[in-house]
């Protein structure tokens, strides 16, 4: 269950708000961005990741203790997420792996250990909120 690590970013099960005279739909509340640092701010970047070679070794993890981090693919593609609970160091015995399906993004909670983005196709281009 990914919920203990953050949000799955999807429009599934969310009723859209029709806007712009019916030419667009807005899906609210798909993820909670968090900037815990006093005076902190969230930024949006474009992140481009090359396909990883498999098999691969998960031999390091990173975390962002001051705020959440979201990856939202700009085209439909799958990617992998390796995550572990908060703590001073990642507990490699508690690492969980997720296949993130087409059309879904993720938002890691602040302090969640994760391996850098793992593209499963030639190129994964995503919006990054940090």
Segments (PLM) and residue ranges:
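A short beta-strand-loop micro-motif that forms or neighbors metal/cofactor-
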Residues: 112-130
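Non-catalytic, conserved peripheral segments adjacent to functional cores
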Residues: 1-97, 121, 130
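Short hydrophobic/aromatic-rich beta-strand segments that constitute the beta-sheet cores
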Residues: 80-81, 107, 115, 128
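Conserved metal-binding segment of the jelly-roll/cupin
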Residues: 99-113
